[in-house]
Amino acid sequence: IALDTLLRTTHHQGIAAEVEDPPYASLEDALRLAASRKEPPLLVALDGVTDPRNYGAMIRSALALGAHGVVSEERRAAPLSPLALKASAGAALKLPVVKVKNLPRTLKALKEEGLWVYGLDVRGEKAPWELDYARPLVLVVGSEGEGMRRLVRETCDELFRIPIREEAESLNASVALGIAL
């Protein structure tokens, strides 16, 4: 009962730890990780993903499926909160998680460094499995409710969409990322 009170939840399996907030990484950290693995960089950029459960699940999928980092804006994304950390199942402590001030500007800078920027969007004509993952790239995913902002979408070299049944309307953002990776 004491642990339930301290944590304000019963979902703890009898274990708790007090830890410092994890530090955010830099883009250079993510690019160094790719270089150390002798792989072309694969970054995931999240535009407006504010739900901490989705944010954590997306970090987890990014780690599991070979991405070298997850990038999002400081003001338009969920923080690495305890809920996001829990949803990431520890992935946020193993993969560079980067916060930037301006996502469109960051994507343009990455393009100048030789990375291709691809977005998941209903306007896309190709499916994500047609992506060339052998080239250095950033895969951009927008929020469930809004999708990518116009400036982010316009920065993309190409848009891809996941073909789904019309009656489904949309996918959860973390599920869409998992399918695309």
PLM features per residue range, with description:
Residues 1-181:
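Post-transcriptional modification and biogenesis factors for structured RNAs
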